[in-house]
Amino acid sequence: MKFNEFLNHLSNYEPGKDIEVIAKEYGVKEVIKLASNENPFGTPPKAIECLRQNANKAHLYPDDSMIELKSTLAQKYKVQNENIIIGAGSDQVIEFAIHAKLNSKNAFLQAGVTFAMYEIYAKQCGAKCYKTQSITHDLNEFKKLYEAHKDEIKLIFLCLPNNPLGECLDASEVTKFIKGVDEDCLVVIDAAYNEFASFKDSKKHLEPCELIKEFDNVLYLGTFSKLYGLGGLRIGYGIANANIISAFYKLRAPFNVSNLALKAAVAAINDDEFAKKTLENNFSQMELYKEFAKKYDIKIIDSYTNFITYFFDEKNSTDLSEKLLKKGIIIRNLKSYGLNAIRITIGTSYENEKFFTEFDKILR
């Protein structure tokens, strides 16, 4: 059977291996997953209780207006319901943005190394990709590339903080850059990890209400997969000018998010104690990862997320990843990004100590 030609130019996204697969493949009893930036404390207690109470409603289609979650988000971010769209993860909203703006006759712009799905989705539309030489977000490079190809570039991705590297721009730098972008070019701010960045440094905090008030061409993305521990329920959102949201709704299938995900998201966003515990643990434990890196002269980029990336000169990241798997520890090998590096999710104190103990043996 023949398929569309563009499929020949696409690669599959490579997620981290599952715990069950590793346990069976390597014959290990205990497996620690530090690969997918999931919340180490699991699902928020309030969301768990909500799921228990609503489990008998799994046969029902969701309220397609999603009014309860939209109202909760609108109150949190000081925007209107009409400024919000809910997706099956923020990935789906990324897909909406790409299909709304890109085609085979135009292009998009991104950092040299960033979230892989931008390029995967955009290639489905045949769009051209412009990347900075820098692997991180160098806005001077962004500006030069944009100015050189302004007629082509109709969408710009800013991943703040950046996955898989962890760096983050100051909010003032971001707004200054957007002022130089034409109104017909959509600027997507992927803020999947911004709660972590804001907790660490208030200068990194991005406020959607201020962004969409000042700019008609900005889309702010958020997710419940990281801080709020609902990755398995697949729910995220976009906040933008009402005209942008209205256009996206033409691309959205009805009932795209389950009723259980919608209910759990409302509960999770109101579980302040869980969020505080997650953030405090994350950055206290990250200091231990920095100390470990210093001990072995491993290069790092200061991370504003719930993960840290280790860069190697002589050691091979694929070899290191394989050795860790044999010890029952799953991390993310970044060879597919062209980097000799590994990304490690910040886990619980127990999980992190297990990583340090085993990785110490490997590096000796």
Swiss-Prot record:
Name the needed cofactors.
Answer: pyridoxal 5'-phosphate
Which InterPro entries does the record match to this protein? Aminotransferase_I/II_large, HisP_aminotrans, HistidinolP_aminotransfase, PyrdxlP-dep_Trfase, PyrdxlP-dep_Trfase_major, PyrdxlP-dep_Trfase_small
Q: Does the keyword Transferase apply?
A: yes
Pfam assignment, any one: Aminotran_1_2
Keywords of the record, alphabetical order, are: Amino-acid biosynthesis, Aminotransferase, Histidine biosynthesis, Pyridoxal phosphate, Transferase
GO process terms (BP): L-histidine biosynthetic process
**Catalytic activity as recorded in UniProt:** L-histidinol phosphate + 2-oxoglutarate = 3-(imidazol-4-yl)-2-oxopropyl phosphate + L-glutamate
Q: A single GO molecular function, which one?
A: pyridoxal phosphate binding
- Pathway(s) where this gene product acts: Amino-acid biosynthesis; L-histidine biosynthesis; L-histidine from 5-phospho-alpha-D-ribose 1-diphosphate: step 7/9
Which residues in this protein are found as N6-(pyridoxal phosphate)lysine? K226
Identify the EC number(s).
Answer: 2.6.1.9
Q: Does the keyword Nucleotide-binding apply?
A: no
Into which family does the record put it?
A: Belongs to the class-II pyridoxal-phosphate-dependent aminotransferase family. Histidinol-phosphate aminotransferase subfamily.
The record ties this protein, via NCBIfam families, to:
hisC
Q: How does it assemble?
A: Homodimer.
The identity of this protein, by name, is: Histidinol-phosphate aminotransferase
